[in-house]
Amino acid sequence: MAANVVIRPVGRDERAAWEPLWNGYLAFYEATLAPGASDVAWERFHDSGEPMFLLGAYVDGRLTGIVQYLFHRSSWTPGNYCYLQDLFVAEGVGSLTLA
């Protein structure tokens, strides 16, 4: 059975849903951040002047995956590159069968 998946920006009011996924990502990589780094990242995701972005995968309305990405200049091309920085899904979500 296919799940109802929607991809959209994670709203500023959804930090409580984002944090467990973000913390799961950091735990998977055994990463420790500088104090306040998550707060700064969260603000950047929601600042239209910043080149950092956050999308969420919502399964039946529940945030179950995140991708954090940014655009940056390159010396190889006149255009920008999109750098996928962080990608994480909740346990069990990766095994969903999508039709």
Protein language model features and the residues they cover:
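Extreme N-terminal starter segment of soluble prokaryotic enzymes
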Residues: 4-5
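Conserved glycine-rich acetyl-CoA-binding loop
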Residues: 76-77, 90-99
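Acetyl-CoA-dependent GNAT
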Residues: 9-79, 85
